[in-house]
């Protein structure tokens, strides 16, 4: 399935685009971004420098007819309402309801596929009720989907960064997932894990120039993180 996707040319829109990280990944695999949306001024400025175009603003003000036809919708919708580091208000937080703005555009435009991203905390938020609502909405939109919590360190990135990823396909395309019951024309496989060749302690020099010195407080903080991560994921 991955090889087939790379050989295809498809159009995408990039919602909650930030500075364009998701867009870069999709473009490296054959996508053409036809529209993006981001509300943060500073993120928009960086996005414009990266891609020479300014994203649309507030997603709640975007009308379906404002969007060029596209095949895939991507959305890293706000994670703060569901994050361990946030207030964990979920759908009670205005930002949490922005998932329904994504659903609104999916319903109106019926793209072939979607890719959603959030923090891992969304899975257990509100005793699982939040993820249940999201699943029910996506089912009602008539999409076949699966989600995973994946750690960036398992896929070639030297950082422990767990995120929730959800991939979905319009049901009429007859695309299923590995291990899913039923017969499908095409099976989608989530990426396989890989082993990192180096740990942090393998690349940090033992002796460095005084010109790179930092404050004692900063040094203590750095040493704390080095000790925590030098052995790699556990």
Please state what every model-predicted region is:
Residues 74, 107, 154, 187, ...:
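Generic N-terminal simple sequence motifs
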């Amino acid at each position: 399935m991955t090889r087939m996707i790379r050989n295809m040319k498809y159009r995408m829109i990039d919602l909650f685009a930030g500075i364009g990280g998701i867009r870069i990944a999709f473009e490296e695999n054959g996508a053409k971004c036809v529209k993006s949306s981001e509300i943060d001024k500073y993120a928009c400025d960086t996005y414009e420098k990266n891609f020479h175009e300014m994203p649309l603003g507030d997603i709640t003000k975007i009308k379906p007819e404002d969007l060029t036809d596209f095949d895939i919708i991507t959305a890293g919708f706000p994670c703060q309402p569901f994050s361990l580091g946030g207030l964990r208000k979920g759908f009670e937080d205005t930002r949490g309801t922005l998932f329904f703005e994504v659903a609104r555009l999916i319903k109106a435009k019926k793209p072939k596929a979607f890719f959603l991203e959030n923090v891992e905390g969304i899975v257990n938020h509100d005793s699982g009720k939040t993820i249940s609502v999201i699943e029910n909405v996506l089912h009602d939109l008539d999409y076949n989907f699966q989600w995973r919590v994946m750690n960036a360190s398992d896929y070639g990135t030297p950082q422990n960064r767990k995120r929730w990823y959800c991939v979905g396909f319009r049901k009429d395309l007859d695309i299923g997932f590995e291990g899913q019951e039923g017969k499908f024309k095409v099976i989608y496989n989530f990426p396989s894990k890989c082993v990192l060749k180096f740990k942090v302690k393998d690349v940090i020099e033992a002796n460095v120039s005084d010109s790179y010195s930092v404050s004692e407080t900063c040094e203590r903080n750095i040493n704390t993180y080095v000790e925590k991560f030098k052995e790699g994921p556990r």
